């Protein structure tokens, strides 16, 4: 096979690869082969898949080239492909909202959804650096190449940061027996990670939320958005009936957890709440223990209704006015429609239509290193 034919064969295989990371993965970029033996390279390659994002990572003092190259292939980077002007900002809460931009030159609408973090397997998560998107207001410009949002693992030069620069020492001592590493003081506080947890709470018609987050003046069964859970408890649910109601629904009893209560455990700060129900909101409790659930549901529906109507109006006028919109714009509009479409019914994983109300609480927690955490240097 000639060199020309070999090049054609290589290019053909490259074009058949679906994702950019299929061509060159992090294990191929990370190591400097001339400075590491084969066993260590294999070990490091296997460990890369188990790395978790840490709080405030640092750029390595001795880079490999991997750190900057990865930015071209990272999935948690949202780079503007055109010059957009912000035409709308529709918010659900301080952690979740949608920015809509318009490129007058190409006549294209695009949308970005602001998210606090992305949840991975086993509850580990990566936070987004939302400084730029949080600064945007209607009328602001988004230039081509601007990173609208990105993982906090990247610095301002778009170098991927996956660890910390710490002082270690190699010596003969019981502390470093086998694979032990003797490191500087304070290391245990430098490698905090973030954990995301999604808690799903079913609430039947004969159940109420215990008043764990309220007081004698107001009733609050779950933490509000931005608040932290108390003592590792998200909420407690109490089943009521005509026989037990006179005692179990007294105000002082509703501020205490009883043995028969169903408890939802979880730690962290609430970054979003969803209320999933097929009930007519007019029939949802408007007073008492579950009033907050109805209020959250009405606020949620108003957000999705405003978002969908705005985006749908743009979509309906696209052909007549000669502009278009991106796939991401369509996806966000479709998600909003699912919440307000009267023909849509929420169902569980077995496709059983909800007969109850489900409260979905998204938590973000900061976790310290503990005994048993794997630390690689």
Where are these regions (language model features)?
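Long, charge-dense accessory insertions within large macromolecular proteins
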Residues: 1-376
